[in-house]
Structure formats: structure tokens, C-alpha cells
């Protein structure tokens, strides 16, 4: 199992017609302050948001956290109020949990759970992320939550999960999101093993598209891994979980250590300033994992993994084609400036030579 760095959080209660779901939540937020450092730890188990779950979907449960880094203990000095939500009177003003039939759990995170839900009035199937207000405050991640909502709410791209809005009640904040039918890529790989090169190339192309779009908006994802990629119909994939995402305007360099150990780039491990090239590195790790079934630098301990990452110690099985190896090597360059641009990833020979077979998938 792979460790990941923690974050997440939520709270809220409101409403408007879901018939206007195509209009994303508009939020007036400031970009003040650094990203808070978070500890991994285990959140206290909370009561289910409903005692009776209707089976609305067959989505997967994510109980496979990867190795993560301890970066901060919770702050227990604050109350349970979440100030960032007080000045928002948006479309979902009167929505409550009672407007939904609650289905099975799709995933579990540090600060909450994701459920499959059906809106009673419209029949719309959505994913509902329920997060504990108390823990948002305890772990001092109000700004992070605000940024996550603002960033995801700004996206309009077929390979990024859509945020419809949020609402809250006394105990929790709820993010209402697009439901992606087949669930996590991680679980698919775990159950089925590595992908063939045709399907892998299609997934990598879509990921490059999504990241290119995010980077064009000066946003870094910073936590790319199969757990944060969902599979929809027709092999369409969607990047999700923007809890570590951050603005990176004017070529600004970041310093916060975050992400999943197997996917960390050399500059993150060495605590250097970094930019959107950390996402490019992570795409290289993902490409390898799609084809091989495990990350390229995975070892028994964090220290051993770090050593292999810093040496760019790549070992390819014989079944990985020369063209796929070439792309992976060009993505996993030690120096960020030498990593292949995303625009060139989309036109790389490995992608181009497999493109003609994508319609047969």
C-alpha cells in the first residue's frame, strides 16, 4: 500500500436547482498565505452520514493509502466554526442532505468520505464528499479547503472532475461532484494488472491534456497517482482530488513538500523550490506504473525509495516497448528543465503510433 500526504476537509448547507449543474460554483476567495503543512495521522472515525444506504452504484472503496510524510500535528485550540464559508450565499443556498438518497461509500480520506448519491428531485447521480468541520479547524486547513473549492470550481475540462457546488450542516461540509462510473484507476490496476500499451498510451495522452490545461491556468496538481484518477465510460479518465493543488502564477516557485512518496520528484525530496515540472515527473511515474503495475522507484523503505529517485534509477521489464521507454526516460529527468513539455508528450512517437488503435478499445 502506498502512503500519501494528508489534507481534505469540508462543511456547509445550501441549495439551488441542480438543473443548472453546468454552472460551476462561483467563489470569491483570497489567495493569502502559504499552503498549510499537514500530518498524515488517522482521522477519528465519524458516524455515517446516514444510517440506511441505498445501493446506487458499484463504485470502489479506496482503502489503499500510500506512504505519506508527517508534516504537522492538528491544532486543537480552535472551535468548530469554519469562517471561510460565512460570506458565501451561492446557488446551493437551501440544499440539505435530505435532498439526496445516500448510496455506498466510493472512497475514504483523512477528513471524510465520498458517497454515491442521487438527487431526489432530478434523479441526478453525483459523488458527495462529506468532511468534518471540526477536523478542518483542528488541522488548520481552512485556507486549503477554500483553495480546493475555488480551483476545482474553475475547471471546465473533460479530463477533470467537475464540482457542482457545496452545502453544509452543523457537523459537516459537503462537496457535490461529478460521479465517474468505473471508479479509481488504482483499483483497476490492482484487480487487472498492468495495461496494454494501447490503453496506457490513451490514458497518458488524456492525463497530459488535463495537466496542460491546469498548467495553462497556472495551477499545479501536486498529487498525481492512480488513486486520484477515475475511469469513466469509453475509457475516458478524469483527474480528481485537488486538495494539494495550488496556484503558481508568474513562474512562482513553491517549497511545500507534498504528494505521495513513490511519485515525489528529486527537487521535492531535496527541498528545493519547484514549479509545474513536478507534475510532469509524476506523469512519468504514472506512465511506468500503467505499463508495469508498480511505480519505478518503489522500495521497502522511504529512504531506499528516495535514493533511487535521486539517481533516476530506472529498470524496465522486457515487455515495455522502446518508444514507451523513451517517453518515460524523457519525463523522468533529474533536472526539471530537461523534462519533456506536455505538448510534446501528446505528439510523442509512442502516443502517435498507438493513436490509431484507440477507437478499438
UniProtKB/Swiss-Prot annotation:
An example Gene Ontology biological process: chromosome segregation
Keywords, sorted A to Z: ATP-binding, Cell cycle, Centromere, Chromosome, Chromosome partition, Cytoplasm, Cytoskeleton, Kinase, Kinetochore, Nucleotide-binding, Nucleus, Serine/threonine-protein kinase, Transferase
Catalytic activity of the protein: L-seryl-[protein] + ATP = O-phospho-L-seryl-[protein] + ADP + H(+); L-threonyl-[protein] + ATP = O-phospho-L-threonyl-[protein] + ADP + H(+)
Protein EC: 2.7.11.1
Record has Transferase as a keyword: yes
Region listing for Disordered, in residue ranges: 1-68
Protein's name according to its UniProt entry: Aurora kinase
The organism's place on the tree of life at top rank: Eukaryota
A single GO cellular-component term on record: nucleus
Subcellular locations according to the entry: Nucleus; Cytoplasm, Cytoskeleton, Spindle; Chromosome, Centromere, Kinetochore
Name of the gene: IPL1
Gene3D superfamilies associated with the record: Transferase(Phosphotransferase) domain 1
Amino acid at each position: 500500500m502506498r502512503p500519501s500526504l494528508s489534507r481534505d476537509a469540508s462543511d456547509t448547507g445550501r441549495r439551488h436547482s441542480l438543473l443548472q449543474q453546468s454552472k460551476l460554483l462561483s467563489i470569491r476567495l483570497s489567495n493569502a498565505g502559504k499552503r498549510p503543512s499537514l500530518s498524515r495521522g488517522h482521522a477519528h472515525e465519524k458516524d455515517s452520514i446516514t444510517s440506511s444506504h441505498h445501493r446506487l452504484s458499484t463504485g470502489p472503496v479506496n482503502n489503499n493509502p500510500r506512504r505519506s510524510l508527517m508534516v504537522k500535528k492538528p491544532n486543537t485550540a480552535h472551535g468548530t466554526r469554519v469562517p471561510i464559508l460565512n460570506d458565501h450565499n451561492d446557488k446551493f443556498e437551501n440544499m440539505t442532505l435530505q435532498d439526496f438518497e445516500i448510496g455506498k461509500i466510493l472512497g475514504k480520506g483523512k477528513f471524510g468520505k465520498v458517497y454515491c448519491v442521487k438527487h431526489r428531485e432530478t434523479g441526478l447521480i453525483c459523488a458527495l464528499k462529506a468532511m468534518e468541520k471540526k477536523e478542518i479547524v483542528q488541522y488548520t486547513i481552512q485556507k486549503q479547503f477554500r483553495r480546493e473549492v475555488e480551483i476545482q470550481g474553475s475547471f471546465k475540462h473533460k479530463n477533470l472532475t467537475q464540482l457542482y457546488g457545496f452545502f453544509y450542516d452543523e457537523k459537516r461540509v459537503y462537496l457535490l461532484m461529478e460521479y465517474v462510473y468505473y471508479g479509481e484507476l488504482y483499483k483497476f490496476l490492482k484487480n487487472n494488472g498492468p495495461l496494454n500499451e494501447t490503453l496506457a498510451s490513451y490514458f497518458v495522452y488524456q492525463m497530459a491534456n488535463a495537466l496542460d490545461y491546469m498548467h495553462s491556468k497556472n495551477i499545479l496538481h501536486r498529487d498525481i497517482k492512480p488513486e486520484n484518477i477515475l475511469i469513466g465510460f469509453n475509457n475516458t479518465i478524469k483527474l480528481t482530488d485537488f486538495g494539494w493543488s495550488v496556484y503558481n502564477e508568474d513562474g512562482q516557485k513553491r517549497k511545500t513538500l507534498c504528494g505521495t512518496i513513490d511519485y515525489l520528484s528529486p527537487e521535492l525530496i531535496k527541498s528545493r523550490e519547484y514549479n509545474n515540472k513536478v507534475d510532469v515527473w509524476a506523469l512519468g511515474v504514472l506512465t511506468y506504473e500503467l505499463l508495469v503495475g508498480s511505480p519505478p522507484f518503489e522500495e521497502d523503505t522511504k529512504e531506499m525509495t528516495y535514493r533511487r529517485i535521486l539517481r533516476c534509477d530506472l529498470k524496465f521489464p522486457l515487455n515495455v516497448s522502446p518508444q514507451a521507454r523513451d517517453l518515460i526516460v524523457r519525463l523522468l529527468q533529474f533536472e526539471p528543465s530537461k523534462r519533456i513539455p506536455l505538448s510534446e508528450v501528446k505528439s510523442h512517437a509512442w502516443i502517435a503510433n498507438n493513436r490509431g488503435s484507440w477507437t478499438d478499445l
